[in-house]
Amino acid sequence: MSDKLHVLLLNGPNLNLLGTREPEKYGHTSLDEIVSELTLQASALGVTLSHLQSNAEHALIDRIHQAKGNVDYIVINPAAFTHTSVALRDALLAVSIPFIEVHLSNVHAREPFRHHSYLSDISTGVICGLGVDGYSWALQTAVKRLSLSH
């Protein structure tokens, strides 16, 4: 592993449709635009950023497993898996990599089934309702915490 810190950005189901899917809830910015902006931000902060978006739970879990020993921090928007995936929770626990949970919308102001997260209690923190800015805040926080621990 290089000396450069590595942050992994994970995005769950339907986030590939950002920019066109329910823009009143999720905004008009595409996932590609978000990732491009975060990649520039990561570079300016002196860290490496890698990204995976998948609609398949197993692909996200496999990537989390591969992160062990190679990734210093995870920023994850698990999308609908937030409310359903014990397997995603177990994968994050298994690798012991700190992570921040991000949601574009305020999940607590939405349908009751969205109020529960299987990840929040094991995360470093949760950012929700700040739109695409939440990703930037999560990346900045991850880098700050990594800098303090190294």
Swiss-Prot record:
UniProt entry tagged with the keyword Amino-acid biosynthesis: yes
Superkingdom as given in the UniProt entry: Bacteria
One Pfam family, short name: DHquinase_II
Pathway the protein takes part in: Metabolic intermediate biosynthesis; chorismate biosynthesis; chorismate from D-erythrose 4-phosphate and phosphoenolpyruvate: step 3/7
GO biological process terms held by the UniProt record: amino acid biosynthetic process; aromatic amino acid family biosynthetic process; chorismate biosynthetic process; quinate catabolic process
Annotated site, Transition state stabilizer, chain positions: 21
Residues annotated as binding substrate: 77, 83, 90, 104-105, 114
Cross-referenced InterPro entries: DHquinase_II, DHquinase_II_CS, DHquinase_II_sf
Swiss-Prot/TrEMBL catalytic activity: 3-dehydroquinate = 3-dehydroshikimate + H2O
Function of the protein: Catalyzes a trans-dehydration via an enolate intermediate.
HAMAP family, sorted: AroQ
Protein family (similarity comment): Belongs to the type-II 3-dehydroquinase family.
Subunit field text: Homododecamer.
The protein, known as: 3-dehydroquinate dehydratase
